[in-house]
Amino acid sequence: MTIALGKFTKDENDLFDIMDDWLRRDRFVFVGWSGLLLFPCAYFAVGGWFTGTTFVTSWYTHGLASSYLEGCNFLTAAVSTPANSLAHSLLLLWGPEAQGDFTRWCQLGGLWTFVALHGAFGLIGFMLRQFELARSVQLRPYNAIAFSGPIAVFVSVFLIYPLGQSGWFFAPSFGVAAIFRFILFFQGFHNWTLNPFHMMGVAGVLGAALLCAIHGATVENTLFEDGDGANTFRAFNPTQAEETYSMVTANRFWSQIFGVAFSNKRWLHFFMLFVPVTGLWMSALGVVGLALNLRAYDFVSQEIRAAEDPEFETFYTKNILLNEGIRAWMAAQDQPHENLIFPEEVLPRGNAL
């Protein structure tokens, strides 16, 4: 930071400039303007999650035990969504539901909205942090653009989907087993695995894993012979100007393997950015569609034929029956307030039974 001698003018002593200088100065942990959003929101979201999983029951919202205090472990504890009867209430601590009573607020599921909203703004703050730092050191903003993928998925699953349904109740609770249950719910009620947006998301994420593995292995395979260091990380000076691996050798190797190969580093790395981020965006779009109850692929002709012909069955018709079973079980289990009772004759049976 440059210090100029002399009197400050009004412009130089402006409060914004003082704040800007303090927030953006070089320190071990960069704060920045984005930090005003990121750090408080991340602190409250993580703190709320630890508080909920440690102490707070889901008995009043789901009829479940969900905390360490009740005997759950890391995989089964969760911060559960509010009850279906509370619809889309923000469940503010000082609102009409809890009326300032912290214990009642926790019992009603107030920690879920607290964690979800602070978590969403915390993620947005982290993306803005990447924008801010990139601008400060004159980098392109592709890191921030890439991080918009996870943000889109989080916002679509935890906020937009339940907003399209009857309440926060149908969002995922914040816990490992709770997320698994939500995945089963998505399959049973939306046939999510047959949704083309889910297919694009899977292709993006798994394709990105494949690209990452291939890229890392190829770079390791084509490293130039280096110094005496015991491993790759010590052998090179991190500030050296020369390349550490041979793009030409890598190109020739993959040209022989596949017949085609990336010949340009920018295109190769853009492709590695494009595949996973596009997959995440497509998944988020698909979840927005589910919020509106848009359907996945339906092969009705196969369903009709399977219903008429006891000897005809496909993997698709078997999965449809499985979805019906999930719905019949989950609806009664998850929504006891609806008093849903399914007689035996309406429960799904495969032709093989």
Swiss-Prot record:
- As recorded in UniProt, its EC number(s) are 1.10.3.9
Q: Which GO terms describe its molecular function?
A: chlorophyll binding; electron transporter, transferring electrons within the cyclic electron transport pathway of photosynthesis activity; iron ion binding; oxygen evolving activity
Please list the GO biological process terms of this entry.
photosynthetic electron transport in photosystem II
**Main location, first listed in the record:** plastid
Under the cellular component aspect of Gene Ontology, which terms does the record hold?
chloroplast thylakoid membrane; photosystem II
CDD domains, per the entry: Photosystem-II_D2
Which parts of the sequence carry N-acetylthreonine? 2
Reactions listed under catalytic activity: 2 a plastoquinone + 4 hnu + 2 H2O = 2 a plastoquinol + O2
Q: Where in the cell is it found?
A: Plastid, Chloroplast thylakoid membrane
Q: Where along this sequence does the record place binding of chlorophyll a ChlzD2?
A: 118
Quote the record's binding site residues for a plastoquinone: 215, 262
* SUPFAM superfamilies reported in the protein's UniProt record: Bacterial photosystem II reaction centre, L and M subunits
Annotated residues for binding of Fe cation: 215, 269
Keywords on this record? Acetylation, Chlorophyll, Chloroplast, Chromophore, Electron transport, Iron, Magnesium, Membrane, Metal-binding, Oxidoreductase, Phosphoprotein, Photosynthesis, Photosystem II, Plastid, Thylakoid, Transmembrane, Transmembrane helix, Transport
> So where does chlorophyll a PD2 get bound?
198
Detail the disulphide connectivity of this chain as listed in its UniProt entry. none
The answer on whether this UniProt entry bears the keyword DNA damage reads no
Lineage: superkingdom: Eukaryota
Assembly description? PSII is composed of 1 copy each of membrane proteins PsbA, PsbB, PsbC, PsbD, PsbE, PsbF, PsbH, PsbI, PsbJ, PsbK, PsbL, PsbM, PsbT, PsbX, PsbY, PsbZ, Psb30/Ycf12, at least 3 peripheral proteins of the oxygen-evolving complex and a large number of cofactors. It forms dimeric complexes.
Additional record remark: 2 of the reaction center chlorophylls (ChlD1 and ChlD2) are entirely coordinated by water.
Q: Which family does it belong to?
A: Belongs to the reaction center PufL/M/PsbA/D family.
What is this protein's function per UniProt? Photosystem II (PSII) is a light-driven water:plastoquinone oxidoreductase that uses light energy to abstract electrons from H(2)O, generating O(2) and a proton gradient subsequently used for ATP formation. It consists of a core antenna complex that captures photons, and an electron transfer chain that converts photonic excitation into a charge separation. The D1/D2 (PsbA/PsbD) reaction center heterodimer binds P680, the primary electron donor of PSII as well as several subsequent electron acceptors. D2 is needed for assembly of a stable PSII complex.
In its UniProt entry, what is this protein called?
A: Photosystem II D2 protein
* Organism for this UniProt entry: Antirrhinum majus (Garden snapdragon)
- What's the name of its gene? psbD
